[in-house]
């Protein structure tokens, strides 16, 4: 099936030429191209046109979940008749296994999986395995992390057709082999139930039920049912059912893996004994033997991913399988905001390796744990054949890859100009900023304020709130789903001002924002580099009244570069507007949820309400006040402690996170007694 682009717009401005150049480059076989597109020029629409022209399965890589969700929603709008999928980390919370030698503290792995994102990941892989050509996967950096072997997954696809002669129990065994679980009481996702000659399967990667009706040993009917009403929505003559998990193995592979694990364990024990370190030798012996026993009896163990090399049949050092293995060789890769995403790809391997080094050196894991890892940058390059780097500020790496040939897209179809940039002194900057904010809020416009640190963002937010301005802050400690909701609340007017650090730069589509204020603009560094300033200024480029105020006591080289480049783009847009009689028009974008998965709590209101009349929202289980808490107060306490646990894990403060986790367990026991 071919891609079918649906849009009420036609390419205008620089878009037709950019689409033509990028399409020609792919058809020529160019390995790398750069699309330099300013904010609001329609880069996503251009890429959608290129995808439709070249008709190749496409992986769009974004550097965070928020932007990935935004791209996913836009691509679904452009290609409603094709497969547009979403593949990001399915962890709501993840604390990796770690060992801290300085305090001799071992932290066990702890996690919470988002069931809906797991379903979306499975659906993405299933559609790729189906052989369909019209598949677009929007992914975060998760696509370079290890997953199951494509061979093992393909071997567990269940193909059925009407009139097929197959014993019902044989089909049930196949379902179990594909990791579907029998549950005759509750038909949850990834489960099946049996009632007489009818087998109902809750498909792991869909929100539908597959009903198979037998007549003796013959499949008489294959139906699709709504998972709520159980009304029939479709009938099939044949059907392919894909596995319920991305990690598959067989009994034969498991037995072989255990033998290899045993051999490597003997070698590692001998290694530690040769060093005269009996404690580490005993530790690795006990841990691995326990894991092997669990695998034999239950088929899994805690941390089984550290043995993935044995189950996949890989050699030491051999790269893991990942999402890229499921794409055909000639797929198209689009790297959005490449100046940020490319360095992120390169940094994943080093961080993973550093954490596992302690686990291996101190006898907690076999050296095979190193092979459960993300791809290295070189491995990533070997697996990608044609890449389009998309950025308003491409870095030197991307420019070198395309040998300096850049496709520019500087004209906005709406006629909107790049924002005016004004430099103001830091003296009385807060009072000046307050005055500017009041002017914008009177016009029902929004303001972004960028600071250098998270603490400054929180304090600025608190200051503005105390002066009656509806304000929120956003930084790396705010969870992914909460971040999306906060941005929606900014757009719908719940907040007038959003204060942030680095998350207000790339790709955020906020047409209501007319002012971007950059505090400490002259503090040269990563957050105030030429590229960072240009990206930050671009957040005001979607509004007809867009303006940027840089608060600084002198103009740095980075500031000057940003001012000059912005002026060049303004001039080009003005000339285009005059030549075509265009009057700049305000972008109007419908308010809608980017992704509605999961039952995530609402974005925390960052205006902290007084809690003087309430009991504390965080308490330790040993505190006598816990006994006087109501059930509702305990639930609130658990929720807040969970938030603190997640924040500690993100900061790599594993000891603190583990303490919070233990308190949550105790508080939950108290809750059960209420």
Regions found by a protein language model. Name each.
Residues 27-34, 56-57, 133-135, 445-446:
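Pre-Walker A (Motif I) flank of P-loop NTPase domains
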Residues 1-34:
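Conserved pre-motif I regulatory segment
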Residues 28-50:
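Walker A/P-loop
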Residues 57-69, 86, 280, 440-462:
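Conserved strand-helix element at the start of the C-terminal RecA-like helicase core
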Residues 34, 87-432, 436-442, 461, ...:
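N-terminal cationic and glycine-rich segments that engage phosphates or anionic surfaces
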Residues 81-89, 303, 446-448, 460-482:
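Conserved RecA-like helicase motor-core motifs
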Residues 478-500:
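Conserved helicase ATPase core of P-loop NTP-dependent helicases/translocases
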């Amino acid at each position: 099936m071919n891609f079918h682009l649906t849009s009420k717009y036609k390419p205008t401005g620089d878009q037709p030429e950019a689409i033509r150049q990028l399409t020609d480059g792919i058809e020529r076989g160019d390995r790398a191209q750069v699309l330099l597109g300013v904010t609001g020029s329609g880069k996503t629409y251009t890429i959608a046109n290129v995808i439709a022209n070249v008709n190749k399965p496409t992986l769009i890589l974004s550097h965070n979940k928020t932007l990935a969700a935004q791209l996913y929603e836009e691509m679904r709008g452009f290609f409603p008749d094709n497969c547009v999928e979403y593949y990001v980390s399915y962890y709501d919370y993840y604390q990796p296994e770690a060992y801290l030698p300085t305090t001799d503290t071992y932290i066990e792995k702890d996690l919470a999986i988002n069931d809906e994102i797991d379903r979306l990941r499975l659906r993405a892989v299933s559609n790729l395995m189906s052989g369909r050509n019209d598949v677009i996967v929007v992914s975060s950096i998760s696509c370079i992390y290890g997953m199951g072997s494509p061979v093992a997954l393909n071997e567990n696809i269940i193909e059925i057709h009407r009139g097929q002669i197959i014993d019902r129990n044989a089909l049930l065994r196949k379902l179990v082999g594909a990791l579907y679980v029998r549950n005759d009481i509750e038909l949850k996702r990834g489960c099946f139930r049996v009632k007489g000659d009818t087998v109902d399967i809750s498909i792991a990667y869909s929100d539908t039920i597959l009903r198979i009706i037998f007549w003796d040993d013959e499949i008489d009917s294959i139906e699709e049912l709504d998972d709520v009403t159980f009304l029939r929505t479709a009938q099939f003559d044949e059907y392919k059912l894909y596995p319920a998990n991305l990690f598959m193995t067989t009994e034969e592979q498991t037995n072989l893996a255990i033998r290899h694990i045993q051999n490597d364990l003997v070698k590692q024990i001998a290694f530690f004994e040769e060093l005269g370190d009996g404690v580490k030798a005993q530790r690795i012996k006990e841990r691995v033997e326990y894991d092997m026993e669990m695998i034999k009896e239950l088929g899994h163990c805690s941390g089984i991913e550290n043995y993935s090399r044995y189950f996949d049949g890989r050699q030491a050092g051999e790269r893991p399988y990942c999402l890229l293995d499921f794409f055909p060789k000639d797929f198209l890769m689009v790297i959005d905001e490449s100046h940020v995403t490319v360095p992120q790809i390169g940094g994943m391997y080093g961080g993973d390796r550093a954490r596992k080094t302690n686990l291996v050196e101190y006898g907690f894991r076999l050296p095979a744990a190193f092979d459960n890892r993300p791809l290295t940058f070189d491995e990533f390059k070997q697996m990608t054949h044609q890449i389009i780097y998309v950025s308003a500020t491409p870095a030197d790496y991307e420019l070198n890859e395309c040998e300096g040939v850049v496709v520019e897209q500087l004209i906005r179809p709406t006629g909107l100009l790049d924002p005016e940039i004004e430099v103001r002194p830091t003296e009385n900057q807060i009072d000046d900023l307050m005055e500017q904010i009041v002017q914008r809020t009177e016009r029902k416009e929004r303001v972004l304020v960028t600071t250098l640190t998270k603490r400054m963002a929180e304090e600025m937010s608190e200051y503005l709130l105390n002066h009656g301005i509806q304000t929120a802050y956003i930084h790396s400690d705010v969870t992914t789903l909460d971040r999306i909701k906060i941005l929606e609340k900014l757009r719908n007017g719940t907040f007038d001002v959003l204060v942030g650090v680095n998350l207000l730069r790339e790709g955020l589509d906020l047409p209501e924002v007319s002012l971007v204020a950059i505090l400490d603009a002259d503090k040269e560094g990563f957050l105030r580099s030429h590229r960072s300033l240009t990206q930050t200024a671009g957040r005001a480029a979607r509004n007809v009244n867009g303006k940027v105020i840089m608060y600084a006591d002198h103009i740095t080289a980075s500031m000057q570069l940003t001012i000059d480049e912005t002026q060049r783009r303004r001039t080009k847009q003005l000339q285009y507007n005059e030549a075509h009689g265009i009057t700049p028009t305000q972008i109007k974008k419908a308010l809608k949820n980017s992704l509605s998965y999961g039952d995530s709590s609402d974005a925390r209101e960052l205006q902290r309400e007084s809690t003087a009349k309430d009991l504390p929202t965080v308490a330790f289980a040993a505190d006598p006040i816990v006994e006087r808490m109501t059930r509702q107060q305990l639930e609130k306490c658990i929720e807040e402690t969970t938030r603190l646990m997640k924040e500690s894990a993100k900061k790599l403060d594993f000891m603190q996170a583990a303490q919070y986790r233990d308190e949550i367990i105790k508080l939950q026991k108290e809750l059960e007694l209420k």
